[in-house]
């Protein structure tokens, strides 16, 4: 594989991993490294009503069979390796995904996942890059991590009113995510980071948007088309 294709491959894996990590959930979270354990996270430090809202959103996300995820960045996000945006349709059971990304200002670079294989379309040809398990980095694509790990340790929750996103009325909540969770999106993270979530107010408790401030830049993931049929073939 030439250097250009290898760079695109790595970038696609990271951004796809961010999408899957946000909404795919499993039964457990990986054990944090010793240096990350520090002071145990105490969710009781936050407003119980806001914690309940977060938990309901987690439960709703765990039940998804398909979703569309739009990834947008601001500033400098080194972990995405040149990708500044992506739009991905993801289906569970069996896992499949298809999308396009903007890589180093080149728009519309297609990629897909089928049968545990990931492919990227470069120079008008689809190239099979192998299985996700062989190509992905440790925790990014692990379905056992998922949204539960990303948001379950959030502290310092504060209500920030309401906001309409793509026609959906949402509750806006800010909080702090521990470094062990931030590493799902930024493997080099060493400290907790502020995050914001927007949760649908229509009774579905869908996670409409999540934004994580990584310091030099931020990653925003917006979900839509929950449980709608998606074309990932």
UniProtKB/Swiss-Prot annotation:
Q: What is this protein called?
A: Putative phthiocerol dimycocerosate transporter LppX
Indicate the transmembrane segments per the record.
Answer: none
Q: Name one GO biological process term.
A: DIM/DIP cell wall layer assembly
Hey, what's the signal peptide range on this chain? 1-26
Pfam families per the UniProt record, alphabetical: LppX_LprAFG (PF07161)
Report the protein's function: Might be involved in translocating phthiocerol dimycocerosates (PDIM) from the cell membrane to the outer membrane; PDIM forms part of the cell wall.
What phenotype has been reported when the gene encoding this protein is knocked out? No growth phenotype when grown in culture, no release of phthiocerol dimycocerosates (PDIM) to the culture filtrate. Attenuated virulence, about 80-fold less recovery of bacteria from lungs of 3 week infected BALB/c mice.
């Amino acid at each position: 594989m030439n250097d250009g294709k290898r760079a695109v491959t790595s970038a696609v894996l990271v951004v796809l991993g961010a999408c899957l990590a946000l909404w795919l959930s499993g039964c457990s979270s990986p054990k944090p490294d010793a240096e990350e354990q520090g002071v145990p996270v105490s969710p009781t430090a936050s407003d119980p009503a806001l914690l309940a809202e977060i938990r309901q959103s987690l439960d709703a996300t765990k039940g998804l069979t398909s979703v569309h995820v739009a990834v947008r960045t601001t500033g400098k996000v080194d972990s995405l390796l040149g990708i500044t945006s992506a739009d991905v349709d993801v289906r569970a059971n069996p896992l499949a995904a298809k999308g396009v990304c903007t890589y180093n200002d080149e728009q519309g670079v297609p990629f897909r996942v089928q049968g545990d294989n990931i492919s990227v379309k470069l120079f008008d040809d689809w190239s099979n890059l192998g299985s996700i398990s062989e190509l992905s980095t440790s925790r990014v694509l692990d379905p056992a991590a998922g949204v539960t790990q990303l948001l379950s340790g959030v502290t310092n929750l504060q209500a920030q009113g309401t906001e309409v996103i793509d026609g959906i009325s949402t509750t806006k909540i800010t909080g702090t995510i521990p470094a062990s969770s931030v590493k799902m999106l930024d493997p080099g993270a060493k400290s907790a980071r502020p995050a914001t979530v927007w949760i649908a107010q229509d009774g579905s408790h869908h996670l409409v948007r999540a934004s994580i401030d990584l310091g030099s830049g931020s990653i925003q993931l917006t979900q839509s088309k929950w449980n709608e049929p998606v074309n990932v073939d």
